[in-house]
Amino acid sequence: MPGARSEAGGVDNPLVLDSSDSDDNLSGLPLNGRVKRIDGNDRSYKKKSLTSMRKSTVVDLTLSDSDEAVESVNLLPGSSSTPDRAAQAGISDKQPSLRRRPRPFMSIADSSSPPENQNVISFLGNHSQEIGELPSPPLVEDRAAPNKMELGGENIAGQNNEANAAQAAVPVSGTPSLTLSSNRPQSVSGAQLVVASSSRSAINSPPRRTPSIPQQSPSSRATPCRSASIASSRSRPPTPPLPATQSTPVTVSRRLASPILSPVQAVSSAIISPTIPSIPSHASLSDPTILSPPSATSAPPNSPIPSTSTTVQTPAAALTYARPSTSAAPLPVMPISVTPATTSPAGPGPSALQSASEATKSSDQKESPRKTNSKQPSSPSSTHGRWTDTRLFHTPSNLSATSGKSSAASSRSKSRAPLSSRAAMSDNVAGPSKTTSVSSTHPPSRASPSSLPSQSQRQVHPRPPSRDGVGKREKKSKTLSSGTGQSTPSKFSLPTSDVASNQKNKSTGLNALPKKPSSTPTSSIPQRTSTLATAMAIRPFVRSPTPPSPQSSSEASRSIQTSRGAVKAAQNQDKIHPLSTALSISSHSREATTKATTLFHTTSSPPSPSQSTSAPTKSHVVWNAQKLGTTVLSSERIHLSRGKSQTSDSVVAPAASQTAASLSYPAGTSGGAREADKKAVETSFHAGPSSADFEAFVQPSTSAIAPTTVRPSVAPPEDAPVLKSGSIIHPLFRAASAIGDQNAFTKTEAVGDVLSQGSKGRASSPRITTTGAVSHLAPHVDLGSKIKPTAAPSLFASGVTTKNVDDQDSAQPQNQTPLPSAISVSSKKNHGSLSKESSIKSAASFISSSSTLGDSVSGLGRKSHHKSTQSMPQSPLPTTNTNNSSGIEVNSWLNPQPFGPSFAASHLSIHAKKKWKERERGKEREKEKVREKEKAEEENEQLRQRRIADLEKLSANLELYKRRMDVESRTRSIPRADGETRKRPPSPGISVSTDAEVRVVKRSKPTWAIAPEGGHVAPAMEKESANVNKKAADAIKINHQPASSYAPAFATPASPAKATRTPLSVTAGLGPPVNSSSSTSTPSLLSRSINLGILRDKPKDHMDDDDGDDSAGGLPVRKTGKNGAVEEQVEQVRLDLDDVSIHGSSPAAPLSIFTSRFRDVSITPSRIQKTLEESDNDVPIQRYAVKVNGKQKAQRSKDKSYGSESENDVPLNWPSRKGKGRTAPEPQDSSETQRDDDDVNLGSGDGEERPSDDDSIPVPPAPLFKDRTAHVRQPLQTLFKGGIVAKHSYQRPLAKASAVSPVPSANRPSPAPSAKADLLPQKRKRRLKKITSQQWQHIAQNSLSDVDDLLGESSKKRLSPENAEKLGADLSKLTRPRVFSIVSRSEPRTKREPIEEDNNEYFTDSDSHTSDVALFSQHPDPPPPPERIREAKRNFDTRNIDPWNRQKHTFRSNPALHRAIFEAYIMQSTSMEESGGDDIKVTNDVDADGGPPDFEFVYSDTMLYPDGIPPPELGLGCDCDGPCDPDSETCTCVKRQELYFYDLGLKGFAYDENGKIRENSASIWECNELCGCPPECMNRVIQRGRARDTGIEIFKTKEKGWGIRARSFIPSGTYIGSYTGELIREAESERRGVTYTAIGRTYVFDLDGWQIRHPPKGLEKIDKRAAELAEAVKMRARAAMRESQEDAYNAYSVDAFHYGNFTRYFNHSCDPNLAITQAYVKDFHPERPLLVIFTRRDIKKHEELCISYKGIPDDDDIPSPEPVKKKKGGKGKKQMSKTSASAHPPEMTALNSDKGLVEVKDICRCGAKNCDGRMFNYGP
């Protein structure tokens, strides 16, 4: 009935739902879940109404093994029909799906998750089966339900009860389902339900800064919401109406109604608490041991309803297990009983429970509102689920449990209800060492009305909050009454649960706890238990129970009455299971006779680190006998499992005939100021066979339950909630906590599963004391599950009680008498034989099989990631020291020598031995390095000696050759083998014979020939002529030839001309030359090739007429009537034929140094191939003589033995003289050729006779080149920065020199003939030929040489302006250089395989570095797994910066606007990358215009991978389900990080619990997207970005340009940012460094971390892929360092010139306050770390943030795993840390068009004490 009010004047049952989906026209909803038909009969909805539930956080509290679970819809009475009511309630056949933000954590229950994830749903569901609707506690993060948790159970409900069974599901998150109008509260049976829901977590998201604002519902403006028991206090303001909130999903099964949870707003001290209707009288009782309530009676019309009372109605026949709609396996739950004693101070009359019970009989009955007597003295009212102290403790209702600000639970959403402004207090105490206790009460004793303080007394004496953070223990026993703060002396000591104040405990992070009136022993049980027993024991105590008012034992005993007949009737039902978890709430009449009651309580507190792990735990059982109350305090020692939990595949299921015990605790207080208060009314919560339908009740057996204590076998995992931003409760206890209100639950911090703050920021385990009769629940275990069950701990019986574990006292268990356990099948027979000193002791094998619930039942369902702390070691401790005179147990932490007397000595000995072995290994490594160095020096010396010997032989051969070819000055004749002397050719006037003589050269294949223009290449003859002198076979024989003009000619087909065979000494392996510089990207790739293909200017000068009729040079000469003897050309050709390595396949084949002497060279593959096929070994060669300088030079050979192939013939392997001769021509086509079939022809000169036009073409057509292969094989090559140097067979260069670079023919001037032909290199000072400006520009553009190479070896790496002028270099016209193949100055000793560029797809022509290609080819990376490869950002987008640059001129006149636009540009660029950081401001107080920096770069916080760079690769992820534990032994990320700590002695992650870096000299390995941990993991600091409180700004300095400074105080170790930019190779960084040197700025940082070349040992055990990469990188680093002779290696660099973020503005300081380290976040390749920046020390406000371009400055402060020997002298680099990153140093010289090369201004202006005046480190 909308708007109906009870007689008490309050809204009876305002079902608060989400206003978004509510319907104002809906009628009330009964709590029992039944739908009332018009005829009065009960009717239940079938399954199809809510069969499909959305994947949301829903807890289904129903259990059943039946496949056909019947679901009922909780509809409101008053509807005409069931479908209509369903429509009014907003229920559809398919549950609507509300789009909800996904959660990275688990969700407590998921209606669409697999069955193994539904056990928590089933586990929690039983709490609300008979309550109907329960309030929700403050929420934590939704987490995934435990996996593989499947427990067996039976359908214990009889068929007779199925018709009346009503089971409910309690949702805990806001999703749409049943909706009602929260603005119009509904009246249902006179019961009020106040619940709270949440749609957001309190853990994973930071709390909002605006607290929730209480709202009022328009339907309840006149009368505040009240309960049904006692009138509200006059001092409390009226309770506000319930606001409209989001709806919550309801999953129903069987015939139960769906309880609705929704938030409640509370104002001031008014506390809204649920009132639960009483139990119908027709409920049946199934077990005699279950506490059952008496029949309910009608409530009088004038009974007052206090705002803090609680009444609960139990649905009828809620005894059946109903399988949830998600097919979750049933989970047996510990039977519990909650007994809040609540009385009305208004005199005799029916209680609120009876009124509520009567109200349920007719759901549409209206009750007239009752007026509250404001003059009536306030009596102790009951706040369900919360304790209150005798003194008021006023605190803001919405304060967090730790910070005093708005709690996360209340500030997450507007729909969450704020906490009550009045914080209830308790006298329980939390010890000084992280203790949080929750205790229940003994049976309340009789309290006289006179002992209660008046209202004024309660207002005058408030209790101030505790300032020391921890409440103190009171020795004096007290009993507290809920809601009034009154206390009366009681017969029994009444322990109460702790209620935290708003004062934060400094040591634990918890709130201060009030004093405890009783020193009841508590136990130490780790939080988040791993056994079913512990989980069951915690369950009823999630919400702090309300203590009863003091009352006598007789009154307490009258609170529960049972009927033996009803019990017997219930036992006759076959299918009633003893483990039924129906939660029944009994209401008792005043006339009921006094029976017995059993009360239990739980204490939750973390253990003291100094106490033994086997400290005995306590359990407290309060037995109220018929006339006498007896307190049973038992103790037992629980030994934690110190290793991994043992698993067991056997499961012992409980017998169906077992009798389930009932655990009960008071849920309310009783007491009053009148005589009528003596008849207290108590309400019991209990689990087991329902007794709600029985009117008669049976007294339960006092021995039904044996007190016991259980402890988990494993430590709590890391993902357990920690009190950081408010009260945090594990999701397992959300629905179960509905027995208390929002305030009470929030203030009880450590109930059940709340963690206290540990010493290192990790959660400590609270102590949990439970009671017996819980270990008998042996659920079904899925043997196929991956998560194996955990064995239960050993249990011992003991009658000795101990003190709190925080008191540092522990006692040995005495009288360890094994007692019958509820686990045993025969335990039901022993219920009556249990004494108060008895306890449970279970056999190890039996417990391991029956307690295999482990983490499954406790809500974890996953393996533990929490390593035990010092108080709970994982491994078993040695027990050698058995004789302990101090009486302390061996394993106790109080034992000074727990490992025996000799353990310390042996341990130290082992430690010293280990250190000694490490030192020895270090010495061996040093010796090995020395040996390697000596070996390298010895090999180098051998190479040098061999080089000297080769040079000596070469010099001797050259001298011999010069003597042979010495030309007589007068006769100009050449001696022949037959002794004749050839005369000079006749004068041009003499007629010339048309028959030319052809000289045949004896060669080995392949050969090439040069024939006269009109002649043809004659086929080689197999035998020589008879006239050949065998002794002079190596000499040159030249026949008489007619006079001719001597000019080069093509190799043409041989003609039948007269030929003379002349064997010629050739070097083995000669062959045709190969074009090596035809490629624009690699012009000098071949070491033994000739630059070919460019036409030369044909010589126009002719020889003078001179006497002589002989040819010159021993080659065929065509006499044309002119003096055509050209010794120079003849000798040049001879040398080319003898010593030039053109095609040699032998490794000893050298490079010709006379490549520049070729005049006209072309490649004719097809023609030469045809010639070679037709020819044999002998190929005729003919060449025309050419006139040089108008003179002829004759040469003669004085040694006829020249040309013989002997051992003295050494290849000519000296470098070419720079500037001498002409530069090698460059081919006009850009394609490269293959060496195997190419050949060389010498072009024709200006001879008058040309046989054909085809022969006169010096260069073949272009198609000959286009079909050639694009790559040239290059074995045994040596390439230097300046060009090509010949290489010997031992792979060492002779000297560093530059080859003459090719110059395009268009830019080459006409060659001037030399006055003197220096055919051979002389041992004299080299003369440099002046290079033109075009030649210099061509060299610079093609990176063929550098300044040092052009000057030769005597330049000493410096080029003076005079030398630059001599070279004629025009340095002002330098353009952007191009990347070519250049290697370092020294060559590795090992031979390399031929390099193919196609082997590595990431090396392109524009970024090809011979050293990189060689290294990556020789030591390639193994292929990456596809699942680890991620997409790289290849291109940067300029769409953001281009509009700013286009509009820059418009806002330069307004500096403020200009700066604002720059700030907006940064914010726009990083909106999707670093959204959590504070905005970056720009300040300019130096410049007159005050503008920001130029928009010259693209702003981004992501690394850019240009084309040619491999994509990022992720590392192996961990399998942690929650935040990673730094002490975990299974987390892969922790193990990998510890390896990279090397010898720093650090454990865990690189960060502490506050996100601060612990050591900035070690590399950081964060978790990645392959890990299972959430974003809140402590190992994801860089991924979360810069914190919002870390404010920075870009400001203009006076001398250093732009810089960065702090806007606020920044502590040490804070993450500032990442140095992002373009990831480029080392070759590219070298090339860009030239440009940056010219402009005076550099933004290049080298990735040269120490860890790159020193991978840790044992990495292959953690990540095999990472170990393979590290090994390949290590080999490349060694090879590169051996080549460059440097101490550092970096394959990549980061350039932030065109692409980066604010870190590019950091200036240099020799004493920086920032440290750059290398981290692996999104790319785990060892060579590609991310440069991250942290603070080295505390930074003040407005202090400039600086880094060091040299790396970390002080070597002594940096620990290194190996001793580092510093180099002598000050030019070497300092040893960097393991991750030190230094800026790429610019070139020492800068280019200047006027002054040549000048010094770079490398001046440091930091002003530090250790400043050396330089900003960069330069190598040797």
Curated annotation (Swiss-Prot):
Induction: Transcriptionally repressed in an HDA1-dependent manner.
Binding of S-adenosyl-L-methionine, residues: K1600, G1601, W1602, Y1643, R1704, N1707, H1708
PROSITE patterns recorded: POST_SET (PS50868), PRE_SET (PS50867), SET (PS50280)
Binding site for Zn(2+) 4: C1710, C1804, C1806, C1811
Keyword Metal-binding: yes
Keywords noted in UniProt: Chromosome, Metal-binding, Methyltransferase, Nucleus, S-adenosyl-L-methionine, Transferase, Zinc
Protein residues bound to Zn(2+) 2: C1518, C1533, C1567, C1571
InterPro entries assigned to the protein according to its UniProt record, in alphabetical order: H3K9_Histone-Lys_N-MTase, Post-SET_dom, Pre-SET_dom, SET_dom, SET_dom_sf
Biased composition (Low complexity): 11-31, 152-169, 226-236, 284-311, 339-352, 400-424, 443-459, 514-531, 551-563, 594-618, 850-861, 1076-1089, 1296-1320
UniProt domain Post-SET: residue ranges: 1800-1816
Catalytic activity, as annotated: N(6)-methyl-L-lysyl(9)-[histone H3] + S-adenosyl-L-methionine = N(6),N(6)-dimethyl-L-lysyl(9)-[histone H3] + S-adenosyl-L-homocysteine + H(+); L-lysyl(9)-[histone H3] + S-adenosyl-L-methionine = N(6)-methyl-L-lysyl(9)-[histone H3] + S-adenosyl-L-homocysteine + H(+)
Gene Ontology MF annotations: histone H3K9me2 methyltransferase activity; zinc ion binding
Positions with a binding annotation for Zn(2+) 3: C1524, C1567, C1573, C1577
Compartments, as annotated in UniProt: Nucleus; Chromosome
Function recorded in the entry: Histone methyltransferase that specifically dimethylates histone H3 to form H3K9me2. H3K9me2 represents a specific tag for epigenetic transcriptional repression by recruiting HP1 proteins to methylated histones. Mainly functions in heterochromatin regions, thereby playing a central role in the establishment of constitutive heterochromatin at centromeric regions.
Entry's family note: Belongs to the class V-like SAM-binding methyltransferase superfamily. Histone-lysine methyltransferase family. Suvar3-9 subfamily.
UniProt domain comment: In the pre-SET domain, Cys residues bind 3 zinc ions that are arranged in a triangular cluster; some of these Cys residues contribute to the binding of two zinc ions within the cluster.
Protein name, entry field: Histone-lysine N-methyltransferase, H3 lysine-9 specific
Source species: Cryptococcus neoformans var. grubii serotype A (strain H99 / ATCC 208821 / CBS 10515 / FGSC 9487) (Filobasidiella neoformans var. grubii)
Gene name tied to this protein: CLR4
